[in-house]
Amino acid sequence: GEGDPFESYFSGNTIQICPVGALTSAAYRFRSRPFDLVSSPSVCEHCAGGCATRTDHRRGKVMRRLAANDPEVNEEWLCDKGRFGFRYAQKPDRLTTPLVRNEDGVLEPASWPEALEAAARGLGAARGRAGVLAGGRLTVEDAYAYAKFARVVLGTNDIDFRARVHSTEEADFLAAHIAGHGRDLDGTGLTYTTLEKAPAVLLAGFESEEEAPGVFLRLRKAHRNRGQRTFSLAPYATRGLEKAGGTLLPAAPGTETEWLDALAANPVSAGLEGDGERASQALREPGAVIVVGERLAAVPGGLTAAARAATATGAKLVWIPRRAGERGAVEAGALPSLLPGGRPATDPRAREETAAVWGVRELPHHYGRDTGQIIEAAATGELAALVVAGVEVADLPDPAGARAALDAVGFLVSLELRPSEVTERADVVFPVAAVAEKSGTFLNWEGRARMFEAALKPEQMTRRLAPADARVLHMLADTLAATPAATEGAGVPGDFGLPDLRAVRTELDRLGRWEGPRATEPLESSRPVPRPGDGEAVLAGHRLLLDLGRLQEGDDALAGTRHAAVARLSAVTAAETGVKDGDELSVTGPLGTVTLPLQVTRMPDRVVWLPLNSTGGGVLADTGSRPGTLVRIGPAEARDAATEAPEVRA
């Protein structure tokens, strides 16, 4: 009503559609006139939606970002994160020159040749015992360069882009169902249009408004225009689900597998009734869709059950990750089990095809380590070196363990935009280009290639632009090849072959899509769900669209629109705990406590929901607990006085 705050993740669209220019943003107001700007078409880097944008810049500085009109993707809309979240690249702490740790243990500026030689010495000595953490924000071309660098230069399949909760089951699922499939890959796969036309949609491990706003807009539009039915397996009905007219299928963490198997079975034999029965029947209608998000990887058997449900009901299955680079990283081969194009890393013919294009005799044939295993091996000394690109330690499943591994590993190379927990521990740091400063491709959740050119060109800049990740890896590989002591007998090619974007795309085209046998289906089973005792609850949570993420830094006005961080309990659990709506609730794990105001919510009992990155250093880092594990809950003053941490039971 009148006087109420305007709370929307899409508020910036009112500025763009204002016919007289009376509405402006705090970030752009009085800073430039439209005729002073150069406009460049671009693609948003903040989620897997692949939204078309227009970047307006002047004198080498981005001034504003607008939605571009793309009827097949984002139509003419853009979320506020995509519109205003570009100032992270303008922060004064941007890395502009390489850094090398000196004999006194201090990082100091170095020339590019000095830094490349230092990195080559360290990585060359660790060849065969090095791992790569590529992160989920890379373009397809950069992710491909990391995949090739790991196999050809470092001699390992120990590479993973998943800087988040992950599992072997998820890797198998991606290899079997996602790699090689998509709109621009094999002509198959779901699109925004087919999703909008679906009669029913089931969401599992996925919250559309928070994790893929463009998808949310299509679901909301389909509900309002066509009566589309959306069902969500989640602890509570989110704002996005309610605005899309959705129905909650209440699922405590870990029960998603049971729900999916029940929906796949005959509704009568499965004992479903009410909303569950209606969801099961709706999924059997032609064109129905099951959407799984990256968080389902935290649920043993969840992705396996989703695939079974899709087969049993005839529904289409689609995976929508949270970060912009994850879908492309699958195709690029930045996984321990996959080579580019969806080729299984353990398939001899797949390795031969790839080795021939890469100009090497052979490739590593063992199944590589995933992110968690790479970190563990670095901590124990099994791995002697790490190459880390754009990974935030707090995003990892075990931030404390990751910090210990980074401290313990013998040699650490970081490729980054700005100082981070990784760069402060690195032996060599290379600055790399931000999205506005390079050309590339994001592969969105549809499998649609979203190519873009650099908005900021070298001739427009007053400072030297950092190179793209792929260019840094090319220079590093060539430096390694020129270091005989490091590569003797290793078969490292004299030319890495990726000096520029055209060379990368040419290699990707030569490799094409794998036409051989697909990877085997995941066969993971569900596991017993933790049973909370007195004063305990199962932790649930997801990240909000606007939170403490590093790519949102630099715009105080955007930060001011974040939703308030609250903890959620059911009315029954709140009464058992001795708290009421608005009270401060403390949630304690093995490493510490998070305290937030309570919002009593309709949700399963003995479950506590927290926003994962909206307070402190993030829930995973501050508590040492991850969703699906047990935590202790209580009134803030009582819990703050307690010193005993709970035993964490998976």
Question: Where do the PLM segments sit?
Answer:
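N-terminal export/assembly segments and adjacent metallocofactor-ligating motifs
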Residues: G1-V268, R568, V572-A575, T595, ...
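A glycine-rich phosphate-binding loop feature that marks nucleotide/adenosyl-phosphate handling sites
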Residues: R31-V38, G136-R137, H166, R308, ...
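Glycine-rich phosphate/diphosphate-binding loops that line cofactor/substrate pockets in enzymes
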Residues: A115-A130, T191-P199, D275-V289, I374-A384
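A cross-kingdom feature strongest in bacterial/archaeal respiratory oxidoreductases
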Residues: A147, L190, K197-L203, E209-R239, ...
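A generic structural motif
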Residues: T156-T168, R226-Y236, G314-G328, V409-V422
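A polyampholytic, Gly/Pro-enriched intrinsically disordered region
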Residues: A175-P199, A251-W259, N266-D275, A334-E352, ...
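Short alpha-helices
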Residues: P235-Y236, E242-L272, G302-L303, R308, ...
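A glycine-rich, hydrophobic/aromatic-adjacent loop/helix-cap motif
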Residues: V289-Q373
